[in-house]
Amino acid sequence: MNFDYNKVIPIKGDASFRKFYRKKIKKKSSIIVYAEKEKIKNLLNYDSINQLLLKKNVSAPRLLSENFSQNFIEIEDFGKKTLFDILKTKRNNKFKIYKKILVTLIKLQNIKVKKIKNFKKKFYKIPIYSKSLLLKEVNLFFEWYIPHIFNKKKRFKIDSQLKKVTSSLLKKIKLPNNTFVHRDFHVSNLMLKKKVISVIDSQDAVYGNMAYDLASLIDDVRLRTSKNMKEMIYQEYLYLNKKKINIKKFKNDFEILSVLRNLKIIGIFSRLANRDNKKQYLKLIPYAWELIELRVKDNDIFKDLKKNLEANFPKKIRFKK
């Protein structure tokens, strides 16, 4: 298959290096995923995870054709509306949609396969979401956000203090890395296909903490939800999940992972703005700070983090637009 720019329509991409195009022939359409950079992850691994999801009865894009040497694959088209688009405009019954999302999440978490074959007939082993990888992600906050807020002298002091705090939080995570984690499980990566929730953007999947994807869904920086809605989703997950869960450990990990994830996101959005000139992501940073505040406010485990953030990141910095 050849990729003809004249026969495809560019569509809005995401925060990755990929480009997306819609190909239309008569009444049929498909999506071209183009990736020159990180093509193993963005093409090979992406399709491998999709095939695994499909085998486990989770709706995901099917591979229609591939031309890896030319940096693209062709996949099934799920349309233009994500669950983000639906929830953003929906006034009633939002919780009903979230309940369906949680059913999909639990199906994902029941996946146990760790080695899969890609379309090049080579095996791909799904990595472990180790604490060193989590720490590497949190460091994006230090690498990309802090340098644009503080001068070099102050930055060194803040880096040193805050890195100790985030490292100590990682040591307080209790649950094992034995659960399939999408790693970007939020409503912008979920679509409806014939009333069935479909999962996209799965190339970064790992085996990690069972609280991670729930934290990603509930404390989603792209979509504001009330504190009450967040708690309802959290309790519904506990109700639906038939596994024996240590509630105290789970809550502990949920809140730590949410905070660390949103620090990472602040770093990623700063990188997108300053390196890639995608300034639109900056407007989401104040809400990421709100989500961090929500989790650290009433939990003693964040005592040192709260003290550090209040001393170094006053509201005029956090909520600067």
Question: What kind of region is each of these model predictions?
Answer:
Residues 139-149, 210-245, 259-276, 288-296:
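Active-site activation/catalytic loop segments of kinase-like enzymes and analogous catalytic loops
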